[in-house]
């Protein structure tokens, strides 16, 4: 399995735990900077590597009038400031070849959303930025189907790939997590990250927005670590009830603070056993 180097740490076999975390969307510059500072301090306390995550545009909101974020230009300015002021690696979503090119020149990691993971032009544009590319497995794909996505990336000259499992469609307005997908995707040669927050979503389950079962985030995160996941993706917020996106499925900073040492201990135990 390929080892993906991010700043002064790496994602892959026998590497320390890495977690991507942050508010789902950039709500304001002040809010985003405070979130980054809080998470940086929290993760340093437990000696866990953090990749800060937030989106400049939530382009796939359920309703047309839902909050989407500050947009590409302003959002990237804020994320670049976080990278420079806090020394954090940053990951953000891209939705078009043009966005991939622009965001890839600013952010160390760009992410292909699950709904867009088969868009060839987007994949190739992301590959050609030279950035690390985190690709979410579509809810509609089998784990082994990601091999075709990988080949597209590699054909674009980029093998700095992180695969992300964020659940699989299970009837209407529901997702299920099949932990077999983690080792199956790892066999494709790249590290696998498990998205524990989007996996508890009820897509469109509240009519004009998605619902979710936040109480299952820790259970799925621990199950994924037990299955050998190389990384976790956990969107977080200082006050989930006030979150402007995915309020039902983001983790409270306070809960994340309590769970980080548990995640780390479990991850290290599994690594010692050679998973």
Swiss-Prot record:
GO cellular component terms given for this protein: cytoplasm
Q: Which Pfam families match?
A: DAHP_synth_1
Q: Can you name one GO molecular function term for this protein? A: 3-deoxy-8-phosphooctulonate synthase activity
InterPro entries per UniProt: Aldolase_TIM, DAHP1/KDSA, KDO8P_synthase
One Gene Ontology biological process: keto-3-deoxy-D-manno-octulosonic acid biosynthetic process
Q: Which reaction does it catalyse?
A: D-arabinose 5-phosphate + phosphoenolpyruvate + H2O = 3-deoxy-alpha-D-manno-2-octulosonate-8-phosphate + phosphate
Q: Which UniProt keywords apply?
A: Cytoplasm, Lipopolysaccharide biosynthesis, Transferase
Pathways involved: Carbohydrate biosynthesis; 3-deoxy-D-manno-octulosonate biosynthesis; 3-deoxy-D-manno-octulosonate from D-ribulose 5-phosphate: step 2/3; Bacterial outer membrane biogenesis; lipopolysaccharide biosynthesis
Q: What is its main location?
A: cytoplasm
- EC annotation? 2.5.1.55
Localization recorded for this chain is: Cytoplasm
| Domain of life the protein comes from | Bacteria
Protein family (similarity comment): Belongs to the KdsA family.
Q: What is this protein called?
A: 2-dehydro-3-deoxyphosphooctonate aldolase
Starting at the broadest rank, the lineage of the source organism is: Bacteria, Pseudomonadati, Chlamydiota, Chlamydiia, Parachlamydiales
């Amino acid at each position: 399995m390929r080892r993906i180097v991010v700043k002064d740490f790496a994602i892959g076999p026998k590497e320390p735990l890495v977690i991507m975390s942050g508010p789902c969307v950039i709500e304001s510059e002040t809010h985003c900077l405070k979130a980054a500072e809080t998470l940086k301090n929290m993760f340093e306390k437990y000696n866990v590597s953090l990749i800060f995550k937030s989106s400049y545009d939530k382009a796939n909101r359920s309703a047309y009038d839902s909050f989407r974020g500050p947009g590409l230009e302003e959002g990237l300015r804020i994320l670049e400031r976080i990278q420079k002021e806090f020394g954090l690696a940053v990951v953000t979503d891209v939705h078009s070849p043009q966005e991939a090119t622009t965001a890839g020149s600013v952010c160390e990691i760009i992410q292909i959303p699950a709904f867009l993971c088969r868009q060839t032009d987007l994949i190739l544009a992301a590959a050609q930025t030279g950035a690390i590319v985190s690709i979410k497995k579509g809810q509609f794909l089998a784990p082994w189907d990601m091999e075709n996505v990988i080949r597209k990336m590699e054909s674009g000259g980029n093998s700095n790939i992180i695969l992300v499992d964020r659940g699989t469609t299970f009837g209407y307005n529901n997702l299920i997590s099949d932990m077999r997908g983690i080792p199956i995707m790892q066999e494709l040669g790249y590290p696998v990250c498990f998205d524990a927050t989007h996996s508890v979503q009820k897509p469109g389950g509240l009519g004009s927005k998605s619902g979710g079962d936040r109480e299952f985030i820790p259970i799925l995160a621990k199950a994924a670590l037990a299955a050998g996941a190389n990384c976790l993706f956990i969107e977080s917020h200082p006050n989930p009830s006030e979150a402007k996106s995915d309020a039902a499925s983001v983790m409270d900073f306070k809960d994340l603070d309590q769970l980080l040492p548990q995640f780390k201990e479990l991850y290290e135990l599994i690594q010692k056993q050679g998973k």
